[in-house]
């Protein structure tokens, strides 16, 4: 569960042992997550509930094999494994953006070298194409978060911010739909355009790519 003030792109964080402050609250049960999200909404926060296919205990425990990723393509499964292993090797307390960006870059390098060793150039090409498309989308969210932050900072009253936010979301929705029609690789953006868009979603969509170059 992610939460942010109505007129801020900075996420609320929670402190955990070992890992420090994290910009999300984790749950193993969806009902509990939705209950907590409702509580945050009651405090006038934007909220976003997102799932994750895997998680890392940073080497403290044996990490489980879950049914959320066993049917992944081979290269995407390798990407996930490299990503989670990266957290074992380097994890900066309280810096979600750095940790996720580092793990993303580490995974891409790992999969590239692994696929080369398997001598499967087509699989590598397909993987890198999927990765590049995902990076393009995430960088779009990075830019939109910057734009929305500037809007909030340029206005003084809540009424002005509320109206500007509403217009920003409507225009962003249209942009997602337009992009989905203009590029076959981005067809799934039409699905994103139908989902709730708020301060939290802009952050959660870009955190793993904000410091990477693609």
Region spans (language model):
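Acidic/His-rich structured neighborhood in mature extracellular/periplasmic domains
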Residues: 1-134
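Short, charged low-complexity intrinsically disordered segments located at boundaries
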Residues: 3-8, 68-70, 133-144, 175-181, ...
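Generic structural signal of hydrophobic/aromatic residues within well-ordered alpha-helices
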Residues: 36, 111-115, 148, 172, ...
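Alpha-helix capping/termination and helix-coil
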Residues: 85, 110, 114, 118, ...
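Long, amphipathic alpha-helical stalk/connector segments used for oligomerization, subunit docking
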Residues: 124-169, 173
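An amphipathic alpha-helical core segment
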Residues: 166-205
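Single conserved hydrophobic/aromatic residue that forms the stacking wall/gate
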Residues: 203-214
């Amino acid at each position: 569960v992610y939460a942010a003030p109505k007129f801020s792109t900075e996420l609320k964080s929670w402190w955990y042992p070992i890992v420090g402050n994290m910009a999300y609250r984790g749950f193993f049960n969806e009902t509990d997550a939705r209950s907590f999200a409702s509580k945050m909404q009651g405090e006038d926060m934007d909220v976003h509930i997102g799932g994750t296919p895997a998680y890392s205990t940073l080497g403290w425990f044996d990490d489980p094999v879950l049914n959320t990723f066993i049917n992944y393509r081979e290269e995407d499964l390798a990407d996930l494994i490299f990503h989670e292993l990266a957290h074992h090797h380097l994890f900066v307390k309280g810096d979600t953006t750095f940790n996720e960006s580092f793990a993303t870059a580490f995974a891409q390098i790992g999969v590239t070298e692994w696929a080369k060793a398997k001598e499967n150039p087509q699989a590598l090409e397909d993987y890198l194409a999927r990765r590049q498309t995902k990076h393009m989308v995430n960088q779009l969210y990075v830019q939109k978060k910057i734009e929305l932050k500037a809007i909030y900072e340029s206005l003084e009253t809540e009424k002005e911010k509320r109206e500007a936010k509403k217009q920003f979301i409507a225009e962003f929705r249209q942009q997602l739909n337009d992009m989905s029609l203009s590029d076959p690789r981005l067809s799934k953006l039409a699905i994103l355009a139908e989902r709730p868009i708020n301060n939290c979603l802009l952050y959660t969509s870009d955190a793993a790519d904000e410091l990477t170059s693609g």
